[in-house]
Each structure stands twice: as C-alpha cells, then as structure tokens.
Design a protein with these regions (language model features):
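Intrinsic structural disorder
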Residues: 1-2, 58, 75, 104, ...
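M16/MPP (pitrilysin/insulinase) zinc-metallopeptidase core fold and M16-derived inactive scaffolds
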Residues: 85-157, 161-163
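M16/insulysin-pitrilysin zinc metalloprotease superfamily fold
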Residues: 155-182
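Generic alpha-helical propensity signal that fires on short helical segments
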Residues: 78-82, 130-132, 170-176
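Intrinsically disordered, low-complexity interaction/regulatory regions of eukaryotic proteins
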Residues: 23, 27, 33-37, 103-111, ...
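Non-catalytic terminal extensions that flank enzyme cores
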Residues: 2-96
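Intrinsic structural disorder/low-complexity segments
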Residues: 11, 116-120, 176-179
Length: 182
C-alpha cells in the first residue's frame, strides 16, 4: 500500500523561455484521448490514456487511466527509455520522501508521477524553443484516485493552455511508447 507521501507528488521546473500568456479560458472539459485512437489505429489498448481534462484559468486537471496490463510504478528499464528523450527529468525539483529532485524517486514512483514530469518537461522544451529567458515555473501534482483500478489525477500549471494540452498528449504518447519498448 502506498503511503500518503508516495500517493502525492509535486514538481516544479523553470523553463528557459517566457512567451506571452494565452487568454484564460475558464473551465473547459475535453474528451479523453489515446494516441492510438487519434491515429486511427486498431492497436491494442494503450497502457496510459487520458479520460478527462478540465482546463482552469491557472492549471489543467487530468484524470488518467492506466490499463490493467500497465505497471502502476516506474522501473529502471522504463526510466532508461525516457531518459533518452528527456535527459533533464532527474534534475526536476520534486517534493518527495527521498529528496528534492525527481531523480531521487524516478526509478520507483507511481506511473502517473512519471507522466506528470514528462508533461512538464515537454512544456519546458516548448517554452525554451520560443525564447531564451523566463521566470515562470511549471508546477505539477499527481495522486491516485484509485490505484487498484489505475485511476489517477495529474494537475499541471501552464502559460498557454493549448501548448499544455499538446505537452500532455506528447507525454502520454512517449510514456506509452517507452512502456511498449520495455
């Protein structure tokens, strides 16, 4: 059983860029997406999919569903695969029971926590590509709603809601790809 501390995790990362902020949309709910469905593929059920996204003025709240075949925690081979694409993951600031960075827990942490950090890294990369300076932090939080059923919630702050949704979609695709390769 997970302790309260391992059920909840927070992350913050400062991007290297700060573009103009998109207008706030208020609360918007988007339907679930799974990368394979978007491509029109009839592939097996993805390991990770987003069931629901609510976009708020300052953050988006994402309900994430893991398939029954999906591990609930990360493992070294998965981390190695993700580090090839996201080498800065271990340096992310992260409140956790073992240290102050994501690197302290990344080899054995809830998979939704991994998804949170990959999405943040995608947002940081997007911000960095736009400009060269920023004082904006991206903050995330993840927690299980029902770990037995594989249902979790990831919350992410953003500067641009569309870029944040794109980052989440990319993160889901990359985590699914990495899980498939392990």
């Amino acid at each position: 059983m997970l302790s309260k501390r391992s059920e909840q995790a927070s992350a913050s990362v400062r991007p290297a860029a700060e573009p103009a902020m998109a207008p706030a949309l208020g609360v918007v709910s988007a339907p679930a997406f799974a990368p394979e469905a978007a491509l029109g593929s009839r592939a097996a059920e993805p390991f990770v999919r987003v069931r629901r996204v609510v976009v708020k003025a300052d953050r988006m709240v994402c309900d994430v569903q893991l398939s029954p075949a999906c591990p609930r925690t990360s493992f070294p081979a998965l981390v190695s695969a993700l580090l090839q694409m996201y080498p800065h993951l271990p340096a992310h600031a992260c409140k956790n029971e073992r240290g102050t960075t994501f690197g302290a827990v990344m080899k054995r942490t809830p998979l939704i926590h991994v998804l949170e950090h990959v999405a943040i890294d995608c947002m940081v990369q997007n911000e960095s590509a736009k400009t060269t300076s920023s004082d904006k932090l991206f903050v995330g939080n993840s927690r299980w709603l029902d770990p037995v059923q594989g249902l979790g919630r990831v919350e992410l702050s953003f500067r641009d809601d569309i870029a944040a949704l794109r980052a989440l979609k990319t993160a889901v695709e990359q985590v699914n790809r990495a899980l498939s390769s392990c």
